[in-house]
């Protein structure tokens, strides 16, 4: 059998609900289902459950249990394959209440969540509803979306619909960046100031002359010797100065490291400062009398010529080594002069 095409589902339900249609069904659910089998189509799917079909003047019978419904469901499944059965036209969608969706659909209250391209993809889904929601409903539930929730890196405020965007939304990102720049400049200013300001103590140390320079200025007024004596004094000073200046150089290096040696261009070694003519003459005179000095005599000489005890001691050591070297060279020269190599 086939269903007539001009019959609507409501035409079957109306005679059943009429007061004169009571003879068509009884209280048992099985006999009621047989009345629907005459049409051989899934018309009863649009009707309510069996308990709602009882008479208005009678209360729902407690003997009617849920175990009577499987016979009704089995008959619905046995009516035929949905491909062969008659298919009614898709009814027009019912108007939905404002802001209500089925539980399987996720609500998106924030219109700024996606860009314009991604919002266009959700257009066909909205067409299924006959009465789509107005834009104002979405604008009421709009909340500010953080930057890390946005789907695209571009500013979503530029992609908003006219109902969701405003003049303040476009100015907000630029005002935030402008407010961050003064803070960065404020943080950079103390760093620049810290780089420029340095302690002035190294300059004062470099301006103060060393004690050796003071001694040389005082000793310049001493008597001048012959040119040969000045050459000898220079030679002696060249031998004695490296040894005398080692300890003082180490002490000054430690002092410079504590005062910030990296600011100056000085090297680690102290500048070579030879003895003056007056100092070398006094030391040579004492060396002729005695090659080895006692501690008391060494202190007296150091006070008279403005030298330290250590400097006098090292000068005498170097002078003895020089005399020893000269004696060895003279002895070798005498030995070689006796032999004539042909």
Swiss-Prot record:
Lineage: Eukaryota, Metazoa, Chordata, Craniata, Vertebrata
GO MF annotations in UniProt: DNA-binding transcription activator activity, RNA polymerase II-specific; DNA-binding transcription factor activity, RNA polymerase II-specific; RNA polymerase II cis-regulatory region sequence-specific DNA binding; RNA polymerase II transcription regulatory region sequence-specific DNA binding; sequence-specific double-stranded DNA binding
Protein species of origin: Homo sapiens
Region annotation Disordered: where it falls in the sequence: 1-29, 187-271
CDD domains, alphabetized: homeodomain
Localization of this protein: Nucleus
Protein name as catalogued: Homeobox protein Hox-C10
Sites of Phosphoserine modification: 189
SMART domains: HOX
Keywords attached to this entry: Developmental protein, DNA-binding, Homeobox, Isopeptide bond, Nucleus, Phosphoprotein, Transcription, Transcription regulation, Ubl conjugation
Cross-link Glycyl lysine isopeptide (Lys-Gly) (interchain with G-Cter in SUMO2) placement: 106, 195, 254
